[in-house]
Amino acid sequence: MTDLTLFYGTMESGKTTKLLQDNYNYRKHGHKVLIIKPLIDLKGGNTVVNRTNEFAPVDILLANDESIFDDKYLPLIKGTEVILVDEAQFLTEKQIIEFWMLAHKIGITVICYALKSDFKGRLFKGTQALIGFADRKNELTVNCKCGETAVFNARMVNGSFVFDG
């Protein structure tokens, strides 16, 4: 049985690095992998890129008003065994349900990588839907500069923490 899996964490917790490693491992074993990210995510253009500048090309840039089941994406999905979704916090609940359907009705392994919350501690809508629909949830952690496990994203302007915006 295939699952919808979520890897989530704060900024710099290694979410995209995990995606890139998963991509490498699945492809090494001969699996057909599709990489997707929301169109709204401008970092890296049509690639997923981590903080050490490792990258992989994106197969689908998915707009918020699009469905993964749109006719233009069906040929790409056909024969796919694994879908990796970067920056999944920007997806809509409808899109999360579609990825759940791909896993449970079509038999494609779907793995999403997402920020848990914004700098105010509020869950992103895509992450909230994933927490509800994902079969497996895995937190990735990173140490804060204070040495403890980071639990929030910080927002800084000109070197100072800000709490508005």
Question: Which residues are covered by each model-predicted region?
Answer:
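Residue-level preference for the first positions of well-ordered beta-strands
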Residues: L4-L6, K32-L34, E81-L84, T109-I111
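Conserved P-loop NTPase "ATPase switch" module shared by AAA+ and STAND
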Residues: I77-L91
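Residue-level signature of catalytic and energy-coupling elements of molecular machines
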Residues: L19, D86, A134
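Conserved P-loop
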Residues: M1-L74, D118-A129, E139-V142
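Hydrophobic transmembrane alpha-helix bundles
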Residues: Y73-L76, E81, V151-N153
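Short glycine/proline-enriched coil/turn segments at helix->beta-strand junctions
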Residues: H29-H31, K78-G79, A134-D135
